[in-house]
Amino acid sequence: KIVRELYRDPDYIDDAVLAEYVQDIWQPLLASARARGDLQPELDQRFAWEILMGRDRTINAFALPGGYFGLHLGLIGVVTSRDELASVLAHELSHVTQRHISRLISKQSAQTPWLIGAMILGALAASKNPEAANAMIVGGQAVAAQNQLNFSRDMEREADRTGFGVMTQAGFESRAFVTMFDKLQQSARLNDNGSFPYLRSHPLTTERIADMQARQPAGASPSLSSGATLEHAMVAARARVLSNPGVDALRAWSADADSKNLAGVAAPRQAAALYGAVLAATRLRDFTQAEGLLGRLTELTRADARAARQTRLLAAELARTAGDAR
């Protein structure tokens, strides 16, 4: 019943393109956790291991009871690589495989289904600010339940270390754990507006950062060797467009793509701008503009197989939407 309510929530988004991209990261992490013995067969069979995406611009991801995980589009939109997203998902997965959720909930004396359900709905449907997020959680007891799901420092360190092993064994770049921490730390210093709720439930300490830095191979580059790919830049742009579907925001994407300075920026930045503009124009039913921008995106991504596939999927979406409008 609780899960059915989650799927009916207006903040829940079922987008095939984003879901495929996330699953392409998530499934190798699950396989790695199984291979390492972190994910016990009993837990594996009993839990859902499913990611639910929320149409929310805040930077957040969280583990929920029963093997469900929440992922805000805001997080997909700010990470610079699939490896950084993998580091967050591996961390959240490890909270569950190490039974942190069950240990925290066991401390709640009134762990009735409605209380847990209210906490889940409030977390997934968190809106544009902390006050609104708390308002979505039914009753003072449910707010207390959410507060108890703030992980201890010991749990955070354990999830970091287990998650690090899971993601590296799955083939993702280990440096992404550090670059993601750097991104969160810098954003926490610059923003105190509630846009990073992830940091409230996952306190980032200098000890955690130092621990992940110490785990890097000797002589490793301080930055990600893979960098931003065209494909990830396009998927991140999609997440940003879908998380802020207002008319003014959609029009801003078109203006960005028409900028004279766009040709002088790196290819991933160009791909993101063009992809976002095509999707925005499609949503605005400006199909002529969308088709023109799509031609530029097609040319830019022609030599990159994964990016070219994203372009073809976008072209099919444009054609389908235009056909439905006629």
Q: PLM features: residue spans?
A:
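Extracytoplasmic and endomembrane cell-envelope/extracellular-matrix remodeling and assembly machinery
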Residues: 1, 12, 20, 38, ...
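Short pre-active-site segment immediately N-terminal to the catalytic Zn-binding motif
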Residues: 70-87, 149-154
